[in-house]
């Protein structure tokens, strides 16, 4: 039996795909004990703050518990393989496509508290990754309206800023999770993003909406904490699993997203 921890946006899609593929699984909160008949664990529980990561600057206890203490407690409580859904928002800058071997450069000295917690958790979990996975996703988006969906955020924000970034389509992510459970490729860190990258303006143009644009300087003044903007290298993932290219994923998902509103 598979244990799925988490009841958030990403966990919903993983549960839906597991059901579609007839996995025997149970869905639990992050305080529940691992059942004795469990064979594999997917940890999609965490704390991202509402409406966005700025909330983590004040809710630091919740951020530490959900993103650092919880995955460590889980790893120390069982010998089962675990697939952690984490974040690729641990880098800043475009000097390269960041690989799984690169040390995070967006942490407590220059990052949001959320990103810093994710970077620290990755470091602390590293000794466990000989028998576990850590999926680093970025800017998740999907075909349904949801306050955590990147498309819904872009639709609702009064002003936007243009950056190039890696992105993760949540249905593709869910299929990838199921593939890893079934095939068990090499353990470790994986950048689970749709290959390539895209920009805010490209996505907004695909959605066919008009927005007012901020400069990078204005955006920096408007947010409570700095944001990660970067492109992750996906070659390691591509060697074991194929996800749609970023541009294709945006185009097809936006089409479905719009159709759900008609």
What are the residue ranges of the model-derived segments?
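Conserved Rossmann-fold NAD(P)-dependent oxidoreductase catalytic core, especially the SDR/UDP-sugar
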Residues: 72-109
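NAD(P)-cofactor binding segment of oxidoreductase domains
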Residues: 55-83
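Mid/C-terminal beta-alpha module of Rossmann-like enzyme folds, strongest
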Residues: 176-179, 183-224, 228-229, 262
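NAD(P)-dependent short-chain dehydrogenase/reductase
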Residues: 123-172
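NAD(P)H-binding glycine-rich loop region in Rossmannoid oxidoreductase-like domains
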Residues: 32-66
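Active-site helix of classical SDR
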Residues: 113-117
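C-terminal amphipathic/interface module of NAD(P)-dependent oxidoreductases
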Residues: 210-213, 225-262
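N-terminal Rossmann NAD(P)H-binding glycine-rich loop of SDR-like oxidoreductase domains
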Residues: 1-21
